[in-house]
Amino acid sequence: MANHSFNLVTEPWIPVLADGKHESHSLETLFDQPTSIRQLDIADPLERVSIMRLLLAIMYAARQEGYSSPAGAKRIMEAGRDQEIIDYLHAWAHRFDLMSETEPFLQVAGMMPQGKPKDYGFTRLHPAMQRPLWQTHDPYKPVTPAEAARMLLVCNMYDVAGVHTGMAGDRKPREANVPHRGWRRPEDSLLPSSTETTCGRP
């Protein structure tokens, strides 16, 4: 079987406006050459905010102690790159592979739904696509790995509400939807945190 891979650290998947041109950058390029990038070139506001949240999460993870001083942050900003973020991406590149067989990005390898699997098609990848009237993507056109990565981010950050199909072997979807009610409002918050008994009652 072919060993498919699409690593978000090295593969271009983020649309940007750089030096007056429409381009696609990888995470590594985005952080390595930030001064040439004017802005994210994404029309969909959900995708744009989702990518911004990912970029912030990477920055905070790479610099858990923050910057030594405002002057230090200014020097890095003027230099146009932050080596600590680049090093972080290289160290954790294996966790950014969209198609990894063991640790796919923002997914669980081998996870299957309860019951018989269903093919929901393209629309489930993006909350805005739930109503075909408003979708801007041809549902019969294959989705590129870059598009799938952006839609996966949106789906993880802005998933639609409602009851979702549970994972095979997980009892929670069947048993966790019943709220515990107490005699008083504070007990409503306390009861779900208890193990067996609270206030002498099961």
What are these model-predicted stretches?
Residues 1-202:
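Conserved small-residue
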